[in-house]
Amino acid sequence: MPSDPEFMKIRSILLKHHDYWSNAIPLIASENVTSPAVREAAISDLVHRYAEGWIGERVYPGNQYFDEIEELCLKLLKELFNAPFIDARPISGVVANLTVYTAFTKANDKMMAISIPVGGHISSGPLKATTGAFIGGTAGAVSRLDVSYIPFDRYGLNIDVDKAIKAIRETKPKIVQFGASVFLFPHPVQDLTPIAHEVGAHVNYDAAHVAGLIAGKQFQDPLREGADTMTTSTHKTFPGPQKGIVIASRNELIEKIKAAAFPGMTSNHHLMHVAGLAVAAAEFKKFGEAYSKQVIKNAKALGQALYERGFKVVCPEKGFTESHTLLVDISNFQHSIGLGADVEHRLEKAHIVANRNLLPWDIIEKRNYRNPGGIRIGSQEITRLGMKEKEMEVIADFFESILIDLKNPTEVASEVSEFREDFQTIHYGFESSWKAYDYIKIA
């Protein structure tokens, strides 16, 4: 075993990290845990290799076996999403979005998307808002798109269809993008796509948060509802490695996507994660529908349990959510604990990991992302650990102890650790003797 002190220090920190997650309740809505089978593929020799170019047309030699892996990966993904073409070159969901923007827009074209303050993702963000004030963003800014926002019902947590129809006709964008990072309910794709096409807009659906629910047939079906393309990361409700994919609804879009993907947006496309994604897709083909159903059941059950304990879970009249995500207004704790950042830190001390999040009305209350009025909760990772509805009651009790009863978070952390003892293996995946957060040692 290596004895270098710096190596040993790095390893000791990694071991602490793995130990923390083995004893925590993971509720980040944008994360998940891969199976040991996926991790095995992701640390294969492919971590060292390049495969520029397309299957059978590589720039580098030595890729005959990787070609087989990528071909199988794409075949499985096309089956899951019922699509004629999928590209797995993007190394993230943001790069997948950037690929679509590159394929179907040019600089200064107009894009309409969900704004960040009401739950939109930064990859739809502009360089500047229409007001001229700097907002920030990633792919939208890099593409230098002129971004305006789809009208949104900030209290119903969904797009305002009537106002959106009017706005699309007035704005005449080149691209309309659905999807969000606070994605509680299906977006009205079927209602708005004909209007977007009427003005000549390309319609993309950013499925990063809900791709697993879509593949598991428990959410909407954007391609059948009219979207031209769908982009997604592969590590949220779809429990694969961190990567991105672009999905086309029809063959005539393929060449533009391919040109944008390579040599446009990617060179090396992280072959080890393609292999991991292939295994994740094989797992999802077998277990995905049951997993997706339980993810939504758990989210609804946790929302109800928190609501019954006095927490202001948004949209109770709509059943809280139709996805994996809950949004909780914690502004009533402002005087006892603080706002979102303070609540997030207090939960983290108790080994409960949920992130602060803007509420759609925070901008009215003059709150910002550094210390917003909400927290966001996701059920997808705890579902992967085998938790079901009865465990949602226990988790809600922990929230009550920490935030309402103001119990010492360190004491609650011990209770959380004891609770987690029964949930150490991956469910809805291929069997393994490895635990979910085991650290793989070389010696």
Where does each model-flagged region fall?
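N-terminal glycine-rich, Lys/His-bearing helix-loop that initiates the first secondary-structure elements
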Residues: M1-L72, P194, E421, T425-A443
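Flexible, glycine/charged-enriched surface loops at secondary-structure junctions
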Residues: I55-G56, F85, N268-L271, G288-Q294, ...
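Short acidic (Asp/Glu) and glycine-rich catalytic loops that position anionic groups and cofactors
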Residues: H17-N23, H48-I55, P173, I254-A259, ...
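PLP-dependent enzyme catalytic core of the Aspartate aminotransferase-like
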Residues: K297, K366-A443
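A short glycine-threonine-serine/GTX helix/turn-capping micro-motif
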Residues: L27-S30, A259-N268, R384-G386
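Conserved PLP-enzyme active-site core in the AAT-like
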Residues: E68, L72-K312, H345
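Conserved small-domain helix->loop->beta segment predominantly found in fold-type I
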Residues: A281, S292, I296-E344, A354-N371, ...
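A generic structural motif
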Residues: D153-G156, E283-F287, N332-Q334, E381-G386, ...
